[in-house]
């Protein structure tokens, strides 16, 4: 129950004016209002965390709490330099929390460079000031290597670090193939020059490649590492029916890498394929093909057709050759037969001459076609002495021949020999023939009866047909009639 003051300004029972009590009563009785504001922070949220002290450094203030806008300053002891901000401020962020700005924590670094640790090397000096160069010596068999090959120097920096810090290297530790081991510890990153590595394989494996490797002066190995292969890398080779196989190298107790197997067949059988070898390569037989033996008399499909085709070709070739030979033989026989019919062997030599015509055993010389149509001609037989023959040829060149039925030439001149003379008329034919015949003392000459018969025959012919040219009655034997 509230007590109100009177008009005289009396106080209430609480010792306050009555109007104040009325205002307080109104505030307590009115409904609450909606107000937007920052959340109320706790005590821990109203201060920044302690930034701490840098090693070999000092902080100001060294104690106390850091409220908003508080400042902390840092410095380093002698011989050390500050790295980072020299002061930081406690700042409120957008989310209402407090924190240091800048947030990087400063540190104090030694102004001298500490000697670095380099494996397989000895560092000469223990204290290095900024700008000093590092002096080291590598162990025997190792060589110094710099990251920057152009500088070839390591310098102490102002922050106490080393620039272009070198290393001492040898040959890098070689790889260990599977199923093998070597005489180098696994903890060694590199080995000195001249080191020899000995590789060995576990039981059941065979070494393929060099057994020893040496580290060369140029920091590379003398050869590539070997590998260990399974001694029985390949399974049993496939068997074939009616055959067997043999190994190279012999005997076939293990089928290691590189083993060659040669197949063969039992007597009476042969391999169907020409290739009969397989090789063990990395645990597999190569080439992978099916081999089998077949009987020798077995013929493959198409073999009979090819055989018939071969016989056909051979038969056709033989028939063609025989026909050609038969034609050649027939032509030769026909040619010989024609020659034998034209000039039999028992005929005198005079009949074989195409310019001689034998009439009742008398050889009569025949003129050529040009001589027959040009004039009269009379020539002694071929068995006259050479002198008479030359005179007859001389007479033939000077005077054209005359035949019965034609007027004798006015320019005919008797030959010097007297053996051959021109026949100007039919009445002189007998005398001309008598002059042409050789004497009875000449071998092979004709007797008087034969001469008389020849003269009589020619006179009868001339008297019967005085106007007929002898060249028209006597057939000319041309060169074309020799061939059949």
Curated annotation (Swiss-Prot):
UniProt protein name: Sushi domain-containing protein 4
GO cellular component: membrane
SMART domains with a match to the protein in the record: CCP
Domain Sushi: 46-110, 111-168, 169-230, 232-295
Comp. bias intervals (Acidic residues): 470-484
Feature: compositional bias, Polar residues: 424-442, 449-467
Disulfide bonds: 48-90, 76-108, 113-156, 138-168, 171-215, 201-228, 234-280, 265-293
Signal peptide as annotated in the record: 1-35
Gene3D superfamilies per UniProt: Complement Module, domain 1
Glycosites: 95, 125, 183
Keywords per UniProt: Disulfide bond, Glycoprotein, Membrane, Repeat, Signal, Sushi, Transmembrane, Transmembrane helix
Localisation per UniProt entry: Membrane
Higher taxonomy: Eukaryota, Metazoa, Chordata, Craniata, Vertebrata
PROSITE patterns linked: SUSHI
Single GO BP term: regulation of complement activation
Disordered, as annotated region: 374-484
Membrane topology (UniProt): Single-pass type I membrane protein
Organism of provenance: Danio rerio
Deleted gene: phenotype: Morpholino knockdown of the protein causes defects in development, abnormal locomotion and increased mortality. At 3 days postfertilization morphants have abnormally (delayed) developed eyes.
SUPFAM superfamilies: Complement control module/SCR domain
Sequence intervals crossing the membrane: 311-331
């Amino acid at each position: 129950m509230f007590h109100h003051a009177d008009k005289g300004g009396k106080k209430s029972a609480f010792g306050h004016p009555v109007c104040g009590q009325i205002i307080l009563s109104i505030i307590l009785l009115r409904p609450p209002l909606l107000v937007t504001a920052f959340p109320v922070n706790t005590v821990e949220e109203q201060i920044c965390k302690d930034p701490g002290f840098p090693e070999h450094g000092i902080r100001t203030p060294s104690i106390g709490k850091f409220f908003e806008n508080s400042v902390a300053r840092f410095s380093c002891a002698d011989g050390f330099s500050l790295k980072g901000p020299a002061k930081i401020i406690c700042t409120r962020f957008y989310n209402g929390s407090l924190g240091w700005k800048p947030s990087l924590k400063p540190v104090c670094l030694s102004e001298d460079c500490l000697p670095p640790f380099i494996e397989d090397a000895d560092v000469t000096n223990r204290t290095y000031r900024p700008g000093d160069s590092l002096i080291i010596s590598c162990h025997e068999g190792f060589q110094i290597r710099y990251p920057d090959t152009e500088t070839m120097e390591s310098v102490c920096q102002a922050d106490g670090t080393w620039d272009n810090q070198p290393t001492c290297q040898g040959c890098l530790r070689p790889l260990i193939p599977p199923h093998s081991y070597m005489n180098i510890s696994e903890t060694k990153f590199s080995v000195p020059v001249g080191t020899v590595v000995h590789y060995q394989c576990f039981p059941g494996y065979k070494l393929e490649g060099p057994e020893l490797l040496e580290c060369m002066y140029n920091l590379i190995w003398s050869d590539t590492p070997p590998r260990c292969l399974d001694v029985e890398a390949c399974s049993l080779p496939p068997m074939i029916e009616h055959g067997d196989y043999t190994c190279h190298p012999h005997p076939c107790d293990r089928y290691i890498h590189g083993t060659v197997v040669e197949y063969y067949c039992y007597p009476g059988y042969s391999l169907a394929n020409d290739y009969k070898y397989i090789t063990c390569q990395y645990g597999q037989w190569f080439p992978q093909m099916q081999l089998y033996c077949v009987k020798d008399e077995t013929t493959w499909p198409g073999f009979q057709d090819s055989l018939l085709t071969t016989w056909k070709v051979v038969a056709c070739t033989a028939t063609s050759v025989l026909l050609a030979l038969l034609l050649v033989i027939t032509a030769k026989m026909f040619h010989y037969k024609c020659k034998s019919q034209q000039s039999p062997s028992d005929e005198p030599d005079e009949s074989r001459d195409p310019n001689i015509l034998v009439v009742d055993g008398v050889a009569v010389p025949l003129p050529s076609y040009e001589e027959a149509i040009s004039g009269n001609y009379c020539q002694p037989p071929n068995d006259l002495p050479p002198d008479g023959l030359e005179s007859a040829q001389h007479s033939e060149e000077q005077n054209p021949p005359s035949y019965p039925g034609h007027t004798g030439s006015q320019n005919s001149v008797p030959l010097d020999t007297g053996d051959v003379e021109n026949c100007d008329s039919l009445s002189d034919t007998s005398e001309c023939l008598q002059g042409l015949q050789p004497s009875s003392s000449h071998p092979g000459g004709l007797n008087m009866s034969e001469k008389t018969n020849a003269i009589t025959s020619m006179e009868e012919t001339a008297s019967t047909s005085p106007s007929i040219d002898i060249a028209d009655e006597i057939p000319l034997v041309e060169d074309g009639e020799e061939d059949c």
